[in-house]
Amino acid sequence: MASRAAAGLLLCGVALVFLVLLQGTQSVYIQYQGFRVQLKSVKKLSDLEGQWAPSPRLQAQSPQPSVCHHSALPPDLQPICQSEEAASIFQALRTIAGDDCELCVNVACTGCS
């Protein structure tokens, strides 16, 4: 009897570890104007913009948003820098990422109107 209980506990523990690992591997993606980026990349974009100020000379020389010149820009955001509308796309992505009702943030996608 004790061995069955131990086996049941072990099975529950394995299932719990599996669920935690599975949840960690799933990413939330935002698709906007043909670009597909991870939510965590957009959040990193906001962090990069807040901590990095490029030189005024660099800003004057480049039509791209200044964050496009940051070496830590996530790879999935880099193609956006090639677009003429990069600044407005980055702004839209930040807006979408900041609004829970724009994302399916819970399993049932409920709670937003």
UniProtKB/Swiss-Prot annotation:
Location(s) in or outside the cell: Secreted
Keyword Secreted: yes
Protein keywords: Disulfide bond, Secreted, Signal
Principal location: secreted
UniProt xrefs under Pfam families: Guanylin
Origin superkingdom: Eukaryota
A GO MF label: guanylate cyclase activator activity
InterPro entries hit by this protein: Guanylin, Guanylin_sf
Swiss-Prot/TrEMBL GO biological process terms: adipose tissue development; body fluid secretion; glucose homeostasis; multicellular organism growth; negative regulation of blood pressure; reduction of food intake in response to dietary excess; renal sodium ion absorption; response to glucose
Disulfide-linked positions: C68-C81, C101-C109, C104-C112
Cleavable signal peptide: 1-27
Propeptide residues according to the Swiss-Prot or TrEMBL record: 28-97
Gene3D superfamilies to which the protein is assigned, alphabetical: Guanylin
Stated role: Endogenous activator of intestinal guanylate cyclase. It stimulates this enzyme through the same receptor binding region as the heat-stable enterotoxins. May be a potent physiological regulator of intestinal fluid and electrolyte transport. May be an autocrine/paracrine regulator of intestinal salt and water transport.
Assigned protein family: Belongs to the guanylin family.
Protein name, as recorded: Guanylate cyclase activator 2B
Species the sequence originates in: Sus scrofa (Pig)
Lineage of origin: Eukaryota, Metazoa, Chordata, Craniata, Vertebrata
